[in-house]
Amino acid sequence: MQIGPYTIAPKVILAPMAGVTDKPFRLLCKRLGAGLAVSEMTISDPRFWGTRKSLHRMDHAGEPDPISVQIAGTEPQQLAEAARYNVDHGAQLIDINMGCPAKKVCNAWAGSALMRDEDLVARILSAVVRAVDVPVTLKIRTGWDCDHRNGPTIARIAQDCGIAALAVHGRTRDQHYTGTAEYATIAQIKAALQIPVIANGDIDSPQKAAQVLRDTGVDAVMIGRAAQGRPWIFGEVAHYLATGALLPPPSLAFVRDTLLGHLEALHAFYGQPQGVRIARKHLGWYAKDHPQSADFRAVVNRAETPEAQLALTRDYFDALIAGVPPPLHAAA
């Protein structure tokens, strides 16, 4: 798949997720097979660009090309300025968020709430495309609710405004993440456009990725929640699409080493105590399908230092590898 001058291969992409797709996670997913990793959204209001959170979100040093940064907001010129600012700070692709269903985002008329105002959508897209010399992409949902499934109209507006690629989550805003994603609307959008279209929503296995690509005709798939605690899913999907064969499940040693490396990257990126705190949700995701995961989380979430967090994690997985009960009572 081509987005401007950038070839995206393999055609499996890490979706932007607030509080998840930070630099350590993007680097990990790219290393494990993602063709593109989109940053968590950065707010367009310049009053917040100097905050600790924003500075972390705008740190792209050492990331492989292309660097894709998502921006969120409601005011066309403010979003245009945010796009320019992020390009000046390393962004090679600008992604506009019109897909986030979170109440606090939609109440501010950002995210998927923008889909209710098609004229405003056109003004925002035109302003951002004119503001920067890099490709601009867009992420949307299929509509606001089942009675207002205007994704195809928004998609046509996006293409007419110069958007370089479009990602579509197969739910409406009012569904949030309930029910199941539908891909018929995505197929309809793909059939009507000339720009690349990316399907998102409930793509949680190599077989599902292949099915969605086949059934919709889209150019790539985007994976979000299924990558939490499973960053190797990108390599699994890429291998299946290339060969038609499934990779064996990752070994416990591979999971342990991947998680320990992820923890170390979080500790280094955020410092103490923030790195330990942010790592806790990732620990829960990695451990959720393993024996005594609830007991492990109860113990490891009490760790206050990087050293303790790493030691508890290593001991837990070493015990699983050895086939003995994890020493959780001793660690507590």
Curated annotation (Swiss-Prot):
Disulfide bonds: none annotated. Catalyzes the synthesis of 5,6-dihydrouridine (D), a modified base found in the D-loop of most tRNAs, via the reduction of the C5-C6 double bond in target uridines. The keyword RNA-binding applies. Its EC number is 1.3.1.-. The gene is dusB. Gene3D superfamilies: Aldolase class I, Putative flavin oxidoreducatase, domain 2. It catalyses: a 5,6-dihydrouridine in tRNA + NAD(+) = a uridine in tRNA + NADH + H(+); a 5,6-dihydrouridine in tRNA + NADP(+) = a uridine in tRNA + NADPH + H(+). This is tRNA-dihydrouridine synthase B. NCBIfam families: nifR3_yhdG (TIGR00737). The active site is at 100 (proton donor). It comes from the Bacteria. InterPro entries: Aldolase_TIM, DUS-like_FMN-bd, DUS_fam, DusB, DusB-like, tRNA-dHydroUridine_Synthase_C, tRNA_hU_synthase_CS.
